[in-house]
Amino acid sequence: MTDFTTMTACGECCIGCAKKESGMCPGCIEAEGKVPEWAESGVCRIYACCAEHNTRYCFLCENFPCGELPKMMPWKTDVEEHFSELREEYRNQRISSESDVTSRLERVLAHWDLEAPGIGEQFNKDSGRLIYKVTAKSGWYLLKGLPSGTPEAVIQGNVQAHLFLGNEHGLAPALYPTKSGDRYVNDMGYRFYLMEFIAGRQMEETPEDEYKLGQATRKMHLLQGYNVKSPLTQSKARYYTWFRNHAFVKEFDGILDAIPYFEELDQCFVHTDIGPHNAMVRTNGEAVFIDLDDSGIGSRYLDLGWPFIMQFVDFNHETEEMRYRFDLAEAFLRGYYGEEGISREEYDLVFQGAVQMHISYMQSYGPYAVDSLWKILRFGMEQKEALWEMIREKEKTDEGGSK
C-alpha cells in the first residue's frame, strides 16, 4: 500500500527517489537541480504547478491529465497511467480511512487532559495536513497534524512560535501541552499538537481590518525575548541565478542590485506572510495571527513589505488587468506607524522589502506564471510614488484638521 504521507506532488518520495541522479532531481526548476529535504520549496516544477492549481498532488488536480504534464516529467513516459493508478488508490484509501479516522483521532486526543473530547469539522481537507476542530466540556480546540516527513526543525519552530506569540503574548493561538508535558505527539504518521480555537472571524480585505492588522504587526515586531531564527532566506544572492534566459533579465538584475542586504538591517520576530488570510479577529476585537510555519527572528522590512505587491496589487487572471489597493496599503501603514507617520527612508526600505518578497515567489507557481508575475512586480513598483504622495497628502490634511 502506498504511503501518501511521504509522497510529494510529483508522485514520488524525495528521500531515496530513484529518479535523482547524483542527488539531483530532473524536475527541478533551478539549474543545479538540487532539491531540499522537504520538496515544498517552490523549486519543483510539479509542486509549483500544483500550488498554482491549489492541489496537493498532480493526480488530484481538476485539470488532470493535462498537456503540460508530459513536458514537466519527460523522464516518465507512463506518467498519466501511473498517476491514474495513484489517484484511484488514494481515493480508496481516503474512503477506508475516513470510516475509522474519528476513533483514531479520539485516541490521539487522549494524550491531552480533556473531558469528553470529540472530533468536529475538518479544515483544509486537501492540504496534506490533518486539521480538526475539537469539542470538549472546557470549550473548543484545534488539533493540527503535520506529516511525519516534515523536518523536526519545522515542527519545533512552529511550536516555539506558538508558545511565544500565543501563550506569552496573546497574538496567536495558544498551544496546550499533553498530560506528560510534551508539546506534540507522534501518531498515525503525523505529529499532532493541540491549539486554542479562535472564536471570532477571519480578517477581510477592508481598510478597517488592514488598520487593525497594521497595529497587530507593530505589536509583534516590538516583542523581545525570542531567539529562534525564521527559516525564510533573507539574502538576495540566489535570485541572481534566476531567469537567465528571460528577456527581462538585465532589468531584473538591476532591481536586485538596488535591494539592500536585509540580513544587516532590523531583525525582530516576524510572521513572513502577513495578510487577512493569515489573521483573525477575536470576538473582543483583538487581532491574532495564524499559520506560523515560517515565523521566527527575521527581517522587519521583508515582513512589513510582504503585502505591498503580493496582496495590494489586484491582478485579474483572465484579463491581466491590474489595479492597486491604495486604500488597503494606506490603512495598513497608518495602523503600523500611528500618529508618528513613516519617514521617506523607512518607506523606501519597506517597499524594497515588498520587491524582494514578491521576487521570492516568482518561481513558486511554475514557469508559465513567470511573465505574469514579472508584470505584477513592475506594476507594483510603479505605484510606489503615488502611494507616498497619498500618504503625505493625508498627513497634511490631518495636521490641518488638528490646528
Where are the regions that the model predicts?
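ATP/Mg2+ or Mg2+-diphosphate-binding catalytic cores
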Residues: 94, 360-403
